[in-house]
Regions:
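Catalytic domains of carbohydrate-active enzymes, especially glycoside hydrolases
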Residues: 32-51, 56
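N-terminal carbohydrate-binding accessory modules
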Residues: 1-40, 61, 193, 286, ...
Length: 299
């Protein structure tokens, strides 16, 4: 289990890619950072996974002072990805618990030696730059096999740079048995319960999509399950929490990460719209399930 201040602590998180409709990777204001963090806290979440991006320093400052935990991704690299492998086949192999070694440089799009060294240099800079933010509790070097390589060496390197924090070595799949967290993504198939001597985390789930036309940037819709009303979205979220997510805690899961904080272009699977004008699910229902999720750790 995760502990915070020597007490068991369930981390109920949200995937946060840090996009805004006017500036994309640039927030419109300092208040925009505060709004996103506070909105997630008000819904009952206590952790944000900053996904595929290093945020402006002010964002981490606000997480520090507002009491929001952070899992920090290293932005992914490598050459063009083989989606049939790192997306479709990987989902099936992950569900079947068939291990895949990170030696397949071509399949994992990491054949370039210069690119691998550049990654090491950049992750060193990231850890050193963000080291003094107490909100950061976990480093995430690789996500879903995107440019993954030498996972154990990279994990050991991060631990040497920063022995005070945890490392989620491979979020999603292609686990190499190293790091502090056994980290899975769940979208389509049954949620596995692997035997592990590491902390078990559901580092992505959900992806439920509802497009509100007057608050969307694109006509296209991307999501793993699509809805046309807030009521239907909320009901399906409740069933997922009741039947799968909350029961997973007694099976050892100690953290969850819902996808995602806000809509992003055609990704209409956010808790709030791209323009931050609408919360798409009933806030009281989301709060209720977050409370049950955290309490289930002690039941």
């Amino acid at each position: 289990r995760f502990f915070l201040n020597d007490q068991p602590y369930f981390q109920s998180g949200v995937l946060d890619q840090g996009y805004w409709p006017d500036g994309l990777y640039t927030a419109p204001s300092d208040e925009a950072f505060i709004y996103d963090i506070r909105a997630m806290k008000d819904l009952g979440f206590n952790m944000l996974r900053k996904h595929g991006k290093i945020e402006a320093d002010r964002w981490y400052f606000h997480c520090d002072r507002m009491g929001m935990l952070v899992w920090q991704d290293m932005p992914n690299g490598g050459s063009s990805y083989h989606h049939w492998f790192v997306t479709y086949l990987a989902t099936l192999l992950n569900w079947m618990r068939i291990p895949v070694k990170d030696l397949h440089a071509r399949l994992l799009s990491r054949t370039d030696e210069f690119g691998r060294q550049e990654y090491i240099d950049d992750i060193r800079d990231m850890v050193r730059t963000l080291y003094n933010h107490p909100s950061i509790v976990t480093w995430v070097p690789f996500n879903e096999g995107w440019g993954q390589f030498s996972t154990k060496k990279v994990t050991d390197f991060i631990h040497r740079l920063d022995p005070s924090r945890l490392v989620d070595s491979a979020s999603g799949w292609f686990d190499q048995g190293c790091g502090d967290i056994n980290s899975l993504h769940y979208y389509f198939l049954g949620l596995p319960v692997p035997e592990s001597d590491r902390v078990l985390a559901l580092s992505e789930f959900g992806g439920y999509s509802l497009r509100l036309p007057e608050h969307s940037a694109c006509r296209n819709i991307y999501g793993y399950k699509k809805f046309t009303t807030s009521e239907a979205l909320t009901d399906s979220f409740s069933r997922l929490m009741e039947n799968t997510i909350v029961p997973s805690v007694k099976n050892g899961y100690s953290a969850t990460v819902f996808k995602q904080l806000s809509d992003i272009e055609e990704e209409t699977n956010g808790l709030i719209t791209y323009d931050r004008k609408k919360i798409k699910m009933n806030p009281l229902i989301v709060q209720k399930w977050n409370t049950k999720l955290k309490k289930s750790l002690h039941s």
